[in-house]
Amino acid sequence: MLQVEQLHQYYGGSHILRGLSFEATVGEVTCLLGRNGVGKTTLLKCLMGLVPAKEGKVSWEGKAITASRPHQRVQAGIAYVPQGREIFPRLTVEENLLMGLSRFSAKEAKEVPGFIYELFPVLLEMKHRRGGDLSGGQQQQLAIGRALASRPRLLILDEPTEGIQPSVIKEIGAVIRKLAARGDMSILLVEQFYDFAAELADQYLVMARGEIVQQGRGADMEAEGVRGLVAI
């Protein structure tokens, strides 16, 4: 389980994250929603150690990781797919996926795990193509596949539907559902597309002005007025 307690972060004189506390449970999709500029991506960077938290505590599987470096969090079983995907455009699909195995020994990191291609068949079809030649939706699938290659127990996704065609959004949603159903992974999904989040969320969190202003069970999102809270 991921536990975040009273997390604060500042940029210059701006108080970006204001005492955030929440949990992301194994076997569930926790959806974090909010309008642009409320601090969602900053929160994820703090969770990955890319931006150090000024105050508060982050714990993973019962151990404090607040001071851990990004590579130590990866070694602990956390994977992050940032906004913008950040694949390696000059490497092939297969080479990109192999990069996700960097936390394993050389012996274990020789071959792309078959389950990645089962989840994303298009990556098998295009494994010899350069990442930069793929469509935006295919690049997003590649970025998620690369993260999954590390066999994470916590998967963090930052707006995976942004700029993606509807057919690929459906495919990504189906993969997230499959991963959650396995029951051995926590999934933290940051999303602005309300319908996508509502379809997947076991738990939801709504951020505004650097704070979590509402939270609850995914099944209650419509009844609890979440759509109106995140409407642009």
Where are these regions (language model features)?
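The feature captures the beta-strand-to-loop junction immediately N-terminal to the Walker
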Residues: 33-35
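ABC ATPase C-loop
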Residues: 147-148
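Helical segment within the ABC ATPase nucleotide-binding domain
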Residues: 170-183
